[in-house]
From Swiss-Prot:
This is Small ribosomal subunit protein bS16. GO terms for biological process: translation. Disulfide bonds: none annotated. One of its GO terms (cellular component) is cytoplasm. The gene is rpsP. InterPro entries: Ribosomal_bS16, Ribosomal_bS16_dom_sf. Belongs to the bacterial ribosomal protein bS16 family. Keywords: Ribonucleoprotein, Ribosomal protein. Signal peptide: none annotated. Transmembrane segments: none annotated. The keyword tRNA processing does not apply. Residues 82-110 are annotated as: Disordered.
Amino acid sequence: MPVVIRLARAGTKKRPVYHVVAADSRYPRDGRFIERLGHFNPLMPKDNADRLKLDLDKVKAWLAKGAQPSDRVARFLDAAGVKKRTPRNNPVKAVPRKERKAQAEAAAKS
Protein backbone atom coordinates (compact mmCIF):
# COMPACT_ATOMS: atom_id res chain seq x y z
CA MET A 1 0.00 0.00 0.00
CA PRO A 2 1.81 3.18 -1.18
CA VAL A 3 1.09 5.80 1.46
CA VAL A 4 1.34 9.50 0.69
CA ILE A 5 1.04 12.51 2.99
CA ARG A 6 -1.05 15.07 1.14
CA LEU A 7 -3.69 17.78 1.40
CA ALA A 8 -7.39 16.88 1.28
CA ARG A 9 -9.69 19.80 0.46
CA ALA A 10 -12.50 20.70 2.82
CA GLY A 11 -14.45 23.87 3.52
CA THR A 12 -17.00 25.55 1.31
CA LYS A 13 -17.02 27.04 -2.14
CA LYS A 14 -14.44 29.85 -2.47
CA ARG A 15 -13.27 29.24 1.16
CA PRO A 16 -10.93 26.25 1.09
CA VAL A 17 -9.48 24.57 4.15
CA TYR A 18 -7.17 21.60 3.77
CA HIS A 19 -6.60 18.61 6.04
CA VAL A 20 -3.10 17.13 6.02
CA VAL A 21 -3.73 13.40 5.80
CA ALA A 22 -1.90 10.13 5.37
CA ALA A 23 -3.74 8.23 2.64
CA ASP A 24 -3.27 5.45 0.15
CA SER A 25 -2.17 7.07 -3.10
CA ARG A 26 -4.89 5.20 -5.01
CA TYR A 27 -7.71 6.85 -3.02
CA PRO A 28 -9.35 10.05 -4.29
CA ARG A 29 -7.97 13.38 -3.09
CA ASP A 30 -10.87 14.09 -0.76
CA GLY A 31 -11.79 10.46 -0.19
CA ARG A 32 -10.83 7.88 2.37
CA PHE A 33 -7.67 8.43 4.40
CA ILE A 34 -5.77 6.52 7.05
CA GLU A 35 -5.01 9.26 9.55
CA ARG A 36 -5.42 13.03 9.86
CA LEU A 37 -2.10 14.73 10.65
CA GLY A 38 -3.05 18.42 10.73
CA HIS A 39 -4.78 21.21 8.86
CA PHE A 40 -3.91 24.16 6.61
CA ASN A 41 -5.95 27.32 6.05
CA PRO A 42 -4.54 29.25 3.05
CA LEU A 43 -6.85 32.24 3.63
CA MET A 44 -5.17 33.20 6.91
CA PRO A 45 -2.22 35.61 6.89
CA LYS A 46 1.15 33.95 6.41
CA ASP A 47 2.43 35.08 9.80
CA ASN A 48 -0.57 33.61 11.68
CA ALA A 49 0.37 30.59 13.80
CA ASP A 50 -2.98 28.88 13.12
CA ARG A 51 -2.47 28.88 9.34
CA LEU A 52 -0.73 25.50 9.48
CA LYS A 53 -1.02 23.02 12.33
CA LEU A 54 0.84 19.71 12.10
CA ASP A 55 1.22 16.86 14.56
CA LEU A 56 4.94 16.46 13.91
CA ASP A 57 5.22 13.23 15.90
CA LYS A 58 2.63 11.55 13.68
CA VAL A 59 4.24 12.98 10.54
CA LYS A 60 7.67 11.66 11.56
CA ALA A 61 6.14 8.26 12.31
CA TRP A 62 4.58 8.08 8.84
CA LEU A 63 7.81 9.21 7.18
CA ALA A 64 9.64 6.46 9.08
CA LYS A 65 7.12 3.95 7.71
CA GLY A 66 7.94 5.08 4.17
CA ALA A 67 5.18 7.55 3.38
CA GLN A 68 6.04 10.05 0.66
CA PRO A 69 4.95 13.69 1.10
CA SER A 70 3.33 15.56 -1.78
CA ASP A 71 5.11 18.63 -3.17
CA ARG A 72 3.16 21.12 -1.05
CA VAL A 73 3.45 19.03 2.13
CA ALA A 74 7.19 18.65 1.44
CA ARG A 75 7.43 22.47 1.48
CA PHE A 76 5.64 22.55 4.84
CA LEU A 77 7.92 19.88 6.29
CA ASP A 78 11.00 21.68 5.02
CA ALA A 79 9.84 24.91 6.68
CA ALA A 80 9.19 23.01 9.92
CA GLY A 81 12.64 21.41 9.74
CA VAL A 82 11.31 17.85 9.64
CA LYS A 83 12.47 16.74 6.20
CA LYS A 84 14.82 18.50 3.79
CA ARG A 85 13.20 19.10 0.42
CA THR A 86 15.22 18.14 -2.63
CA PRO A 87 15.74 21.04 -5.03
CA ARG A 88 13.96 20.90 -8.36
CA ASN A 89 15.95 20.17 -11.48
CA ASN A 90 15.66 23.33 -13.56
CA PRO A 91 17.80 22.86 -16.66
CA VAL A 92 19.09 25.93 -18.41
CA LYS A 93 16.67 26.62 -21.23
CA ALA A 94 16.89 28.76 -24.33
CA VAL A 95 20.61 29.43 -24.17
CA PRO A 96 21.59 30.75 -27.61
CA ARG A 97 24.09 28.74 -29.58
CA LYS A 98 27.52 30.11 -30.41
CA GLU A 99 26.57 30.85 -34.01
CA ARG A 100 23.48 32.77 -32.92
CA LYS A 101 25.54 34.78 -30.45
CA ALA A 102 28.04 35.63 -33.18
CA GLN A 103 25.24 36.66 -35.56
CA ALA A 104 23.66 38.83 -32.88
CA GLU A 105 26.98 40.53 -32.13
CA ALA A 106 27.62 41.11 -35.85
CA ALA A 107 24.16 42.59 -36.27
CA ALA A 108 24.69 44.84 -33.26
CA LYS A 109 28.00 46.17 -34.65
CA SER A 110 26.56 47.06 -38.04
